[in-house]
Design a protein with these regions (language model features):
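Helicase-associated low-complexity regulatory tails and linkers flanking the ATPase motor
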Residues: 1-225, 230-421
Length: 421
């Protein structure tokens, strides 16, 4: 059976309750869709919604602690918006003024708290708990992405507020009463922002984005944590991000790659010292207590990697046979094997590593193959060739003429032989 071969996935071990909730959801899905029990049967994404959100956070439910819990019909009360409503009370109009329900405090305690020797958050969300630990250990700004609101962005925000990191605009903080003293960074109160497609949760994305990219926010002095969802994050560019966390996978790697691209841009880290221009990427996944079983998020990463490998094979063929392949051979000099230089970098947790500069074999940018490849045909270009038209100045001066000529040619034919060109 195929395995995850190239992706470096950050695996979190589930605690008893979350593991039990996940297994319960899977059993209910098998009852509803018997074909899932067949080994070769694929899984539709709509079926994965519940299991994926459970692996983000499983909201506690006393029915799940009973002996006959498999006979209970409580699937949707364990995750997402319904699960959140069951354990918390809040103003549904403004989506603020969050408070624990008395029944939640009596039976389970402050479930979003990461404090103490036995933090409650760890029982219900291995991923969010680990993210909180990474925030505490890190210098610089942390970016976290989730596709879900009630099962992702909101519980992340509540967990941050439980540790004392509040919303940039204090009027937008979720808890009605601040549960902790402010968490300090270099003497400043640590803040977070949340950029989503929900206007109630994120009424002023521009203001929060401006604060996050402010030159004075070099190490998270103004905004320590940025929470984003798919709907709210498209087209955004951040600066000086030191950690990127992807809370759950998607069926292909494009979404994760786009999210990483929000924090890794050209000149996005120029304000930082050279040895601190690092971005750590965490692709969060789950390790079940039944270690022989594969969690749904690991399954999705495996499927996504397999797709990416096949796409890479096609991409490599296009590169090898591209009309400008020989002209762009110098691009391959960006590979780590060709550069052959190591530098010492400091991670966000202040640990240092030796890093080899350049593109790596079997990475996305190298099509999950060796980075070096030969053009087809691989002609020798050592003889004198006029390159006066192969430069930026020529393109700038002549781009309109060239485009018009191409359009006219396509009006006549859409296929031309080399001799005609």
């Amino acid at each position: 059976e195929e395995q995850i071969n190239y992706l470096d996935v950050y695996v979190n071990k589930l605690q008893d309750f979350q593991n039990k909730a996940y297994n319960y959801i899977i059993e209910k899905l098998k009852e509803k869709y018997p074909l899932l029990q067949e080994k070769k049967q694929g899984i539709q994404y709509t079926m994965m919604d519940g299991p994926l959100q459970i692996l983000n956070i499983a909201y506690p439910h006393e029915e799940l602690l009973s002996e006959d819990y498999l006979n209970k019909d409580i699937e949707k009360e364990l995750y997402g918006k319904k699960g959140l409503r069951r354990v918390m009370k809040y103003n549904k109009t403004t989506k603020k003024e969050f408070e624990y329900k008395e029944s939640t405090l009596e039976k389970f305690g402050r479930i979003f708290s990461s404090n103490g020797d036995e933090p409650l958050l760890k029982k219900y969300s291995a991923k969010i708990y680990k993210f909180i630990q990474k925030v505490k250990e890190s210098d610089g700004i942390c970016l976290i992405y989730s596709n879900f609101i009630g099962g992702g962005c909101v519980p992340i925000a509540l967990a941050l507020e439980e540790m004392g990191i509040y919303r940039l605009n204090s009027n937008r903080s979720l808890f009605k009463t601040k549960p902790q003293q402010p968490y300090k960074i270099n003497g400043n109160n640590a803040k977070y922002i949340m950029i989503t497609g929900d206007k109630k949760l994120s009424p002023n994305n521009k203001e929060e984005l401006k604060a996050a990219t402010d030159p004075n926010n070099l190490n998270g002095e103004k905004v320590k944590v940025i929470i984003i969802s798919k709907a709210g994050s498209e087209g955004l560019d951040f600066k000086n991000i030191r950690q990127v966390h992807i809370l759950e996978p998607w069926y292909n790697l494009n979404r994760a790659d786009q999210t990483i691209g929000r924090g890794v841009r050209k000149k996005s880290h120029c304000q930082l010292p050279f040895n601190q221009r690092t971005v750590e990427v965490y692709l969060h996944a789950s390790d079940l207590q039944e270690s022989q079983l594969e969690s749904i998020d690991l399954y999705m990463y495996r499927v996504a990697e397999n797709k990416a490998i096949k796409i890479g094979q096609v991409t490599r063929l296009l590169k090898e046979n591209a009309i400008d392949c020989l002209l762009n051979k110098n691009q391959q000099q960006m590979n780590s094997s060709n550069i052959g230089k190591n530098i010492t970098l400091q991670l966000s947790n202040k640990k240092t590593i030796d890093y080899q500069i350049g593109h790596k074999d079997n990475s996305l940018i190298c099509d999950f193959m060796e980075c070096n490849y030969l053009c087809k045909p691989n002609n020798d270009l050592s003889q004198d060739i006029g390159i006066e038209t192969y430069n930026q100045n020529y393109i700038i001066m002549n781009i309109e003429k060239i485009l018009n000529k191409i359009k006219l040619l396509f009006k006549e034919h859409y296929i031309y032989e080399k001799s005609e060109l």
